[in-house]
Amino acid sequence: MLKVGSSLLAADGGGLSPRFALGLAQFVSANLAAGREVVIVSSGAVAAGRAILPKAAEAGAAIAARQALAALGQAQLIALWQRFFERPVAQVLLTHDDLRNRRRYLNARATLGELLRLGALPVINENDTVSVDELKLGDNDNLAAIVAALVDADALFIATDIDGLYSADPRSNPLARPLDEVAELSAEVLAMAGGSGSSVGTGGMRTKLEAAAKAGAAGIETYLFNGRSAEVVRGLAQDRLCGTRIHAARTRIAARKYWLRHAPVEPGTILIDAGAALALTDKGASLLPGGVAGAEGDFRRGDMVEIHLRDSVGSRCLARGVSQYSALDVRRIARRHSREIEPILGYSYGENVVHRDDLVVL
């Protein structure tokens, strides 16, 4: 799995440039020649769109303008990658809804698997033309990590515009030293992450470490490297360690539990009491309506939500899971016995608000 950021593809005067993409394509080709399957997650659609329609670019960060720029630039982005390969390049656009909904998640996995079987090169991007929240808050680093787990990748390579992870921000601290390997993403390591390296993209070093943590939970190592360095890219193509290697977690979680833990959540929360919290964390129980204190947001049945304990200390997230009931229904059956669900609602989807098989404790 290779993730390429906007800063490596955007031309100085606008649009896309093959300057660094060529070396990355050669890295991909070397892996393909070695018999490995490769999936690319590539940013750059918005940057490409700015050159096509400067008038839209003048609108700045307005969501509608960025969506229009993404629509204009996505074809250019795919064309950039296709020029480097004889094999067909397949465009795959995903949203958080595709990753949050279990059926769509599995459909995406099946599609990517078939593309790889057919010998195509999937190039994935978020569908920024419709993903309002992703344009404001999202990034392709975390998308790459989730997709890496989706396709059961062996490694995640994140190409950036610096040499990897440093002990401090090298742009402001002359004593910063590069880290060749990171055995564990501790709080100390996360604190080393600075801000975004470029105004072109939306992800900084912090999001790359978050992505590495997500990939690591699935047993996938992450490599952060400087995609602007021809020497580094050539070294990687020859299986030499260049940049920062971030080890995978010692214990790999099951595929479904991984999805429950890392899939995007619907903006909504189920609030529980201390008794329910104990049942979830210590006994591995399902969440029953009697332990529910309320619900926030407007989630639907089947949505992924966070489960919070709210007490005198405050509110904190204890678990995530797929709700069997909508937010409105959860509020109506809160504090009630399971046998009261059908008399109250007029229907029942089962005695659990969240079944233990659809729940992961954080």
Curated annotation (Swiss-Prot):
ATP binds at residues 3, 160-161, 202-208. It is found in: Cytoplasm. Keywords: Amino-acid biosynthesis, ATP-binding, Cytoplasm, Kinase, Nucleotide-binding, Proline biosynthesis, Transferase. InterPro entries: AceGlu_kinase-like_sf, Asp/Glu/Uridylate_kinase, G5K_ProB, Glu/AcGlu_kinase, Glu_5kinase, Glu_5kinase/COase_Synthase, Glutamate_5-kinase_CS, PUA. GO terms for cellular component: cytosol. Residues 267-348 form the PUA domain. Substrate binds at residues 43, 128, 140. NCBIfam families: proB (TIGR01027). This is Glutamate 5-kinase.
